[in-house]
Swiss-Prot record:
Protein name: GMP synthase [glutamine-hydrolyzing] subunit A
Subunit structure: Heterodimer composed of a glutamine amidotransferase subunit (A) and a GMP-binding subunit (B).
Entry keywords, A to Z: ATP-binding, Glutamine amidotransferase, GMP biosynthesis, Ligase, Nucleotide-binding, Purine biosynthesis
Function: Catalyzes the synthesis of GMP from XMP.
Coiled coil regions in record: none
Pathway involvement of the protein, from the record: Purine metabolism; GMP biosynthesis; GMP from XMP (L-Gln route): step 1/1
Organism: Haloquadratum walsbyi (strain DSM 16790 / HBSQ001)
Disulphide bridges, residue numbers: none
CDD domains from the UniProt entry: GATase1_GMP_Synthase
Catalytic-site annotation from UniProt: 75, 163, 165
InterPro entries per the UniProt record, alphabetical: Class_I_gatase-like, GATASE, GMP_synth_GATase, GMP_synthase_A
GO molecular function: ATP binding; GMP synthase activity
EC number: 6.3.5.2
HAMAP family: GMP_synthase_A (MF_01510)
Length: 184
């Protein structure tokens, strides 16, 4: 059975990420972000870097990026991917929370391509990715956030700025199904 570790970055929706994966039949574990990478790699087939309030409270998450397993960053998790791998993160022009219509820019993307041409999502963030790291491509955009999603297919690193685990996100379950497929 596929085992995915959800890394707890103290986000308000982290338990929903765990529940969404569990409901899809995955062996899922909620793991504190101070857990050693060596311990994670023993059982995890993939990692979800949860959202959270502050990039200064991500524990060992930067070290997890060295692991040779697929990683999905959600909200703060996506910002962490960008920040640690050479992209940039800054305050967004809009911030806050809202239903947002996003445009899928790459219908072949393994994480969100199946959502093309557009979908409605729940966003809740003040900061956002301003430039993607080398090797990544921008895979979604909206009127309120230029980089709504990004991916590096070669390294199996994916990020979404929105929250697929929240009921307000249409087709959020599909995002998790697509990530599970990358972990199998």
């Amino acid at each position: 059975m596929t085992h995915i570790a959800v890394i707890d970055n103290h986000g308000q929706f982290t338990h929903l990420e765990q529940r969404a994966l569990r409901d899809l039949g995955v062996d899922v574990e909620l793991v504190d972000n101070t857990t050693s990478p060596e311990q994670l790699i023993q059982t995890a087939d993939g990692l979800v870097l949860s959202g959270g309030p502050d990039i200064d409270r991500v524990g060992n998450c930067p070290e997890y990026l060295e692991l040779d397993i697929p990683i999905l960053g959600i909200c703060l998790g996506m910002q962490l991917l960008a920040n640690e791998l050479g992209g940039s993160v800054a305050a967004g022009d809009y911030g806050g929370y809202a239903d947002v219509d996003i445009e899928i820019l790459d219908d072949t993307d393994p994480l969100i391509g199946s959502l093309a041409p557009e979908t409605r999502v729940w966003a809740s963030h003040a900061d956002e990715v301003k430039s993607v790291p080398e090797g990544f491509e921008r895979t979604a955009r909206s009127d309120v956030c230029r980089i709504e999603a990004m991916s590096n297919r070669d390294q199996e690193r994916y990020g979404v700025q929105w929250h697929p685990e929240v009921a307000h996100t249409e087709r959020g379950e599909e995002v998790f199904k697509n990530f599970i497929a990358r972990c199998q």
